Amino acid sequence: MNLKLLVFLLIVLGFRFYLFYQNQVKFADGQEVSFETAILSQPQVVGSQHRLTANYKNQKIRIITSRFPELNYGDFVRISGKISSKNDRALMYFPKIETASQSSNVLQAGLQKIHTLRQKLIVLFSKTLPSPSSSLLLGIIFGIKEQMSKDFSENLRATGVFHVIAASGMNVTLIAGFISSLFALFLKRQIAIGLSIFGIAFYAVLAGLEASIIRASIMGILVFSAQIIGKQTLAVNGLFLAGFVMLFISPNIISDIGFQLSFTATLGLIFIPKIRAIRKIGVIGDSINTTIAAQIATLPILLANFGTYSIYSILANGLVLWTVPILMVVGGFGAILGLIVAPLGQLLIYLCYPLLLYFETIVNFFGGIGGVLVVNNFPWQFSVGYYCLLVSGLIIFKKK
């Protein structure tokens, strides 16, 4: 990207940030509010509670409410209650939530249809596979974690594989890379990358077209489109331009972990060179290489936000992530077919069972042997120093 253009865009973005935060409302502790909003991400179910995030006057409000009545992605609701403002975070505990009337909205109607479709698929998967295999496959394809057992969920976290079921930006980036590697074994590179782009779009729809998934999908499609053309510069320019547009429209996403992981993981896949010796292993080697690149790029973000890191993470990811595109393709087609002819769809879904058992065995094995590093009060100075060293190393490597 032209240096003058980059400086200009940064100045524009800086001015946009200034205006955004100058006009941002500061909520007082105990302040009464009432507002209408659409639920643009699937609420989390934790025990007997619903947890969701709502946007009000350019502020994110974390809401904790009762499990019933059920709230779904795409619902338009009126929320009334008191705000608890602590440490610059706005929370609402058990506010009054009512269904709000709204004029016909094509987008909202589409979102509600997607939710209804997902609910039917959840029932289909649960009837076909035992737990935790059904919940694992639901997590991989739809990012649904509510039905997963606490023990297995903890093992996923302990081994650094939790991102697979998080429907996150990092997940989109990794999955696209794996699909490309898989199809490149028997198809031309351009066709394999084209199928990866289709896979990204397909995943975004199945995951519910949530904002974080759409952002990550745009980044992934830009990168893989540039690979078809054969210009790394185009991928970088496209990624930075996408990041600029997203931040200009919604400056508060700069603190969103999903956005941070999407952006840095994608940069890692573009710039961090693949290890040739590992690449010779085949599909698993490509999985390990992709994992290494993504984890090198995102390590400070993961440590700062989650405070833990598994020393076996790269190995565990390399052993299981090659199964993800297969599970997504077979399970995804099984889900679609199951809506038309349930028995045939269930047959395809059941074909995923051996790979799911393999996945679970690896996760439970590494989750049971420990090796988790706990980092408390992660210093921001480390992140700055880490990325300075990483950029310097890549520049030196490129010159050789």
Where is each model-derived feature located?
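C-terminal regulatory/interaction regions
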Residues: 2-5, 19, 46, 50, ...
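Hydrophobic alpha-helical transmembrane segments in multi-pass membrane proteins
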Residues: 2-7, 12-15, 152-314, 377-400
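Membrane-interface helix/helix-cap signal primarily in integral membrane proteins
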Residues: 7-163
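Transmembrane helix-loop junctions and nearby membrane-interface residues
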Residues: 17-24, 204, 306, 332, ...
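Divalent metal-coordination and catalytic microenvironments
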Residues: 37, 81, 140, 168, ...
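Hydrophobic alpha-helical transmembrane segments
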Residues: 107-115, 135-146, 207-213, 232-238, ...
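Membrane-interfacial loop-to-helix junctions in multi-pass transporters
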Residues: 130-134, 149, 189-195, 323
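Alpha-helical transmembrane segments of multi-pass integral membrane proteins
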Residues: 268-373
